[in-house]
Amino acid sequence: MAVDPPKADPKGVVAVDPTANCGSGLKSREDQGAKAGGCCSSRDQVCRCLRANLLVLLTVAAAVAGVVLGLGVSAAGGAEALGHARFTAFAFPGELLLRLLEMIILPLVVCSLIGGAASLDPSALGRLGAWALLFFLVTTLLSSALGVALALALKPGAAFAAINSSVVDSSVHRAPTKEVLDSFLELLRNMFPSNLVSASAAFRIFATSYVSKDINTSGIHPCGACPQRSNATMDQPHCEMKMNILGLVVFAIVFGVALRKLGPEGELLIRFFNSFNDATMVLVSWIMWYAPIGILFLVAGKIVEMKDIRQLFIGLGKYIVCCLLGHAIHGLLVLPLIYFLFTRKNPYRFLWGIVTPLATAFGTSSSSATLPLMMKCVEEKNGVAKHISRFILPIGATVNMDGAALFQCVAAVFIAQLNGMSLDFVKIITILVTATASSVGAAGIPAGGVLTLAIILEAISLPVKDISLILAVDWLVDRSCTVLNVEGDAFGAGLLQSYVDRTKMPSSEPELIQVKNDVSLKPLPLATEEGNPLLKQCREPSGDSSATCEKESVM
């Protein structure tokens, strides 16, 4: 029986049938080699796995080592035994990590949002933004409801009838009372910054302080004819040196949409911002290898700084457990369940891809500082497209505060139980709505959620002075809040990526999406006497030399 000769491809290379005898012989030899060196093969797989996840393991180990080191130094005398100079040197590596991360937040947020908004057509941009805001709103409401339910079930403030004065740190200042209207006006002021050119304006937010002033009023004093003096509290908006992420987000999105409207004329500027963003991500990859050292000393320094940490855990242990349990349930059950229901993918594999940003969030206690690492991990390890992650994650770092909303609800119920106040249905609904709304304007900075807790307490007529008890342990609870906040941002980006993959969202100009990868920059042709430098040649994809055209450059 004749056997057909092997066929050749157009390039003249003979194709080899993988089912031929030589292929089976090669496969059997490989199997024999694998069986002979099975131990070595498994050892190599373990080494490859460790090398691939080295940064994750180092970051988690650094966080655990920071807790152990901090407790050990506290047992040996703490910050007082070290002295001011030694404690400053002890905490300096952690401070350096924060400064490195904050250094690249400004270019990263601006460039990523401009590139992401410009890469999507207006209809797709609107749909993505609407779905993202809906996801953030639903998850924040769920976290608020979970916080209220846990606080009502565990009753953390019922057994806290008498508080020892040593529980409250003397260095903690009481948070001032803030009106709801002033908080809303602050949100609007920060959305529209007055100056983006000044270097300090981007790192400046508006805040309202209350100043007590004596006012002369006309009138007759009962004891004689003299003007009366009354004391009044007046609101006084001022600027604080904190990064105005909300203002940068609003400006960058609007500017990116404007570049999209320009069409080809704005393509060069879009490519500039994309290249700037890629260079910033290279800096992020370098900083990530310093993150374990910084996280170790950040966590250890904060524990050493606290006074009488044992008494704090004894007095407020039930409140801490309630907050941490709520964050664990929402982060390990609720968010993964939502992700699985909509994507049908393993959510815990997605979580493993963002372990490094989660550990960084625990160490830095700042959603904004974790943003660069989160962008890099969701793109490289979880397969989220750049124009989605760089558009959604900065918005999530500003408006998505699941952890803060849960903590605020637990704290409000805790203070209500502490003061013996019963919460009816109307007050519970008030707590849920106020916590969800106020968490949107909470700054992505350490202790940002505590600043908005006063709004909830004022809404249900609770004393604001009890916030000092919350501040005493906020250094721990706030880290758990930050981990949950950034986890919600990452799951939101993953859900939107799945939505885009299912719907195959069209774009009116696909070449604007990731211009750097799709448009190759070729060197300009040599100038000739007959050639016009303002003319460029366009060749058809077929490569036919006769099919050439000339048109005036749009650049």
Curated annotation (Swiss-Prot):
Q: Could you give one GO CC term from the UniProt record? A: melanosome
* Gene3D superfamilies in the record: Sodium:dicarboxylate symporter
Carrying Phosphoserine, the residues are: S507, S508, S520, S545, S553
Lineage, please? Eukaryota, Metazoa, Chordata, Craniata, Vertebrata
Q: Name one Pfam family in it.
A: SDF
Q: Name the PROSITE patterns for this protein.
A: NA_DICARBOXYL_SYMP_1, NA_DICARBOXYL_SYMP_2
Glycosylation-annotated residues: N164, N231
Q: What is its main location?
A: membrane
Give the sites modified to N-acetylmethionine. M1
The molecular function terms in GO held by this entry are:
antiporter activity; L-aspartate transmembrane transporter activity; L-glutamine transmembrane transporter activity; L-serine transmembrane transporter activity; ligand-gated channel activity; metal ion binding; neutral L-amino acid transmembrane transporter activity; symporter activity
Assembly and interactions? Homotrimer.
> What name appears for this protein in its UniProt entry?
Neutral amino acid transporter B(0)
Residue positions binding Na(+) 2: T398
| Species whose genome carries this gene | Rattus norvegicus
Keyword Iron-sulfur belongs to the record: no
Report which reactions are catalysed by this protein: L-glutamine(out) + L-serine(in) + Na(+)(out) = L-glutamine(in) + L-serine(out) + Na(+)(in); L-glutamine(in) + L-serine(out) + Na(+)(out) = L-glutamine(out) + L-serine(in) + Na(+)(in); L-threonine(in) + L-glutamine(out) + Na(+)(out) = L-threonine(out) + L-glutamine(in) + Na(+)(in); L-threonine(out) + L-glutamine(in) + Na(+)(out) = L-threonine(in) + L-glutamine(out) + Na(+)(in)
Instruction: Provide the topology term for how it sits in the membrane.
Output: Multi-pass membrane protein
Q: Which gene encodes it?
A: Slc1a5
Summarize the activity regulation. Down-regulated at acidic pH.
For the Extracellular compartment, the record's topological domain ranges are 83-95, 155-239, 300-320, 415-427, 462-474
Family of the protein in this entry: Belongs to the dicarboxylate/amino acid:cation symporter (DAACS) (TC 2.A.23) family.
**Which residue stretches are annotated as topological domain Cytoplasmic?**
1-52, 118-131, 263-271, 343-347, 379-387, 497-555
Membrane spanning stretches: 53-82, 96-117, 132-154, 240-262, 272-299, 321-342, 388-414, 475-496
Q: Write out the residues that bind Na(+) 1.
A: G396, N400, N485, D489
